[in-house]
Amino acid sequence: PTLGWHMARTSEPVPLDLQMRFYQGLYVEQVAMDQIGPGQRMPADKNLACERTIQTLACNLDQMIIQPAFNVDGVVIRPDAISSHGRELKEIKSAKSLKDDYVLDLVINKSAAEHNGVPIESSTLMLVNPEHRCGDENPKMVEIDLTNEVDKLSETYDIADEIAMLRQPEPPAPVLTRDCRKCPFLSECFEESDDLIIHIPRLTERKFSPFLGNDIMYMADIELDVPLFNTLTA
């Protein structure tokens, strides 16, 4: 949450590699849409798209809605596709393997839809098929059913609360994790950030967790707990 709060207030030029990934994503999205089949694309205008999405879903026709839009407290969320009849969400990624962030994307989309009174029964991720070769019969995209994973995570996720957190004037209290090592806002969250235990070489999650459990965040404090200190060389 703390990283999201800072990112929401950061504006930097988009580097060339990310621009290329964006265009790559557009191409893969079109390939996926061709494989899904015909559907009704919502307007580019986000406000009009929100209105049309709800109207189209209310018709309960057996068709795919492309780029639907859901308004949550003034923030518009646009999933890649949703079936108006089966209430299936589809998320398209220009990648070959599953990542945790992709599950979260589906959770956000599901939460936005259900915030607007649209129940979601299943969640599907579409990835580039690594087995596809030009001219063969393998599909260009593969589908992964993530319904169970998305439903479980959705039990503790509230999109309205997340949006409210991003809008609050002060950042949420930071929680130290091993991933903080690569965060550009580390020094803004923690004093003496260079002395944090996350900088210990080859520190595994198994060794890291007991330190936090004993409120030890800085290397200068490690020697105060001899048993934990000894685990670093075990």
Residue ranges with predicted function:
Residues R133-N148, F185-L203:
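Short His/Asp/Glu-rich catalytic/ion-coordination signatures at enzyme active sites or charged loops
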Residues I159, L166-R167:
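Solvent-exposed beta-edge/loop recognition patches
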Residues D195-T233:
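Helix-hairpin-helix
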Residues P1-L3, R167-L196:
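Cysteine-cluster motifs in flexible loop/terminal segments that predominantly coordinate metals
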Residues A112-N116, E188, N214:
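Active-site catalytic microenvironments for nucleophilic, acid-base chemistry
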Residues L18, F22, A95-V103, A173:
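Short, charged/polar micro-motifs that form catalytic or ligand-binding hotspots
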Residues C50-M64, F70-D161:
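Nucleic-acid nuclease catalytic cores
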Residues P1-R87, R206-I222:
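Metal-dependent nuclease catalytic cores that hydrolyze phosphodiester bonds in DNA/RNA
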